[in-house]
UniProtKB/Swiss-Prot annotation:
Official protein name in the record: Eukaryotic translation initiation factor 2 subunit 2
UniProt keyword annotations, A-Z: Acetylation, Cytoplasm, Host-virus interaction, Initiation factor, Isopeptide bond, Metal-binding, Phosphoprotein, Protein biosynthesis, Ubl conjugation, Zinc, Zinc-finger
Originating organism: Homo sapiens (Human)
Lineage: superkingdom: Eukaryota
BP GO annotations: cytoplasmic translational initiation; formation of translation preinitiation complex; in utero embryonic development; male germ cell proliferation; male gonad development; translational initiation
Length: 333
């Protein structure tokens, strides 16, 4: 309460607490209080210090109100948040800082950037990619293409359908360069001693391969190639089947039917190996040779340089015997 609200009343008197009246036991056992005891009652006189007491009460209330106001102010001040000072961003200073960083990064080489990236970014989940496995035909084509490049560098064997001059079978006139090439080719054929240092080229017809169904392949011009090479069909057939690792036979149309799916490039590679080993001479690389058998060995005799050398025998590769095993199991059961 403030001092304005207090009104001075002279009739008011301060209330005093009542004193407890103890009781005493007489010799006879009766209880006696102060009222029963013979004592003189004292009259309450009004104290002259009532004004002082009222002033003290007013001061106490004023102090309490002031302390309450201070507590409220402190409470509100604690709740108020301090405003952060806004920093002014200068574009020019930022550009200069970026340039300095770039110069420092160019001078200093990065050390182990992969580990830092892993720490910063964390382990990210990698997306699963659908892996497509290539077909057997595509794998074989790639392998055979690499083998062709290697063999063409070493061997002078090539396959082409042209048997005569380039202008044969057409109405166009021949050129001067074509005539020169023809003259030099004739000279080399007639006089092989003139071209001792040069490599000779052996030109062959390409094999004609046709699919028969889904599991067989037909070698159409098999007999024609045997005649061009001056070799027996049995010898060439044994080499083809051993290198390809399959089985096959010659049908009524003189075509070789092979079990399995094969492409023209694969058979060309096998023929190139056969020509290099059993047709061309090992000394002069001439195709004019004769294959002779003497005491279980094959000898290659050249008609141009008259050299004679032995040739490796044909060995069959690994072949699975699933059919025989199946028959043996069936008999055992």
């Amino acid at each position: 309460m403030s001092g304005d609200e207090m009104i001075f009343d002279p009739t008011m008197s301060k209330k005093k607490k009542k004193k407890k009246k103890p009781f005493m036991l007489d010799e006879e056992g009766d209880t006696q209080t102060e009222e029963t005891q013979p004592s003189e009652t004292k009259e309450v006189e009004p104290e002259p210090t009532e004004d002082k007491d009222l002033e003290a009460d007013e001061e106490d209330t004023r102090k309490k109100d002031a302390s309450d106001d201070l507590d409220d102010l402190n409470f509100f001040n604690q709740k108020k948040k301090k405003k952060k000072t806004k920093k002014i961003f200068d574009i020019d200073e930022a550009e200069e800082g970026v340039k300095d960083l770039k110069i420092e990064s160019d001078v200093q080489e990065p050390t182990e950037p992969e580990d830092d990236l892993d720490i910063m970014l964390g382990n990210k989940k990698k997306k699963k990619k659908n892996v497509k496995f290539p077909d057997e035909d595509e794998i074989l084509e790639k392998d055979e293409a690499l083998e062709d490049e290697d063999n063409k560098k070493d061997d002078g064997i090539s396959f082409s359908n042209q048997t005569g001059p380039a202008w044969a079978g057409s109405e166009r006139d021949y050129t001067y360069e074509e005539l020169l090439n023809r003259v030099f080719n004739i000279m080399r054929e007639k006089n092989p001693d003139m071209v001792a240092g040069e490599k000779r080229k052996f030109v062959m017809k390409p094999p004609q391969v046709v699919r028969v169904g889904t599991k067989k392949t037909s070698f159409v011009n098999f007999t024609d190639i045997c005649k061009l090479l001056h070799r027996q069909p049995k010898h060439l057939l044994a080499f083809l089947l051993a290198e390809l690792g399959t089985s096959g036979s010659i049908d009524g149309n003189n075509q070789l039917v092979i079990k399995g799916r094969f492409q023209q490039k694969q058979i060309e590679n096998v023929l190139r190996r056969y020509i290099k080993e059993y047709v061309t001479c090992h000394t002069c690389r001439s195709p004019d040779t004769i294959l002779q058998k003497d005491t279980r060995l094959y000898f290659l005799q050249c008609e141009t340089c008259h050299s004679r050398c032995s040739v490796a025998s044909i060995k069959t590769g690994f072949q699975a015997v699933t059919g025989k095993r199946a028959q043996l199991r069936a008999k055992a059961n």
